[in-house]
Structures are given as C-alpha cells and as structure tokens.
C-alpha cells in the first residue's frame, strides 16, 4: 500500500525534494569552494616553514561562512 501511494505521489515528492534541496546543495558547494580557495591562498602566501614552528591551517565549515583557524 505504501508503494502504491508513493508511486502515485512520487513525482510531486521528488519535485518537492528538488525544490528544497537543490538551492542548499548549491550554497554548500559555493561555501566549500570558497573554503578551498581561501585555504589554497593561505598555503601559497605562507608556505610551511621548515623550522620548529610549522604553520598549519585548519578549515572549519560553518553554515554561512568559512572560518580558517591558524594553529601554532
């Protein structure tokens, strides 16, 4: 019975999922690309030093922005 109801309303259900999830997926892809780009800039501008003080960058994904934390 559940399968028959799902087949009848499957197109509407899938359409609703696409309407809800596609903008959020696009937003997360933009945030991830921004984080990767910013992390790449930081690694290029400040390369890993060979002395006792290495520079390590950690990228934390937030819902709205990308937070890059430098750990000494």
Swiss-Prot record:
InterPro entries: DUF5433 (IPR035270). Pfam families: DUF5433 (PF17498). It comes from the Viruses. This is Uncharacterized 8.4 kDa protein. It comes from Vaccinia virus (strain Copenhagen).
């Amino acid at each position: 019975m559940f399968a028959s109801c799902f087949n009848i309303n499957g197109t509407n259900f899938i359409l609703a999922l696409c309407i809800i999830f596609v903008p959020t997926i696009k937003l997360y892809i933009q945030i991830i690309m921004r984080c990767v780009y910013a992390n790449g800039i930081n690694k290029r501008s400040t390369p890993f030093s060979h002395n006792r003080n290495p520079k390590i960058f950690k990228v934390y994904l937030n819902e709205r922005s990308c937070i890059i934390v430098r750990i000494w």
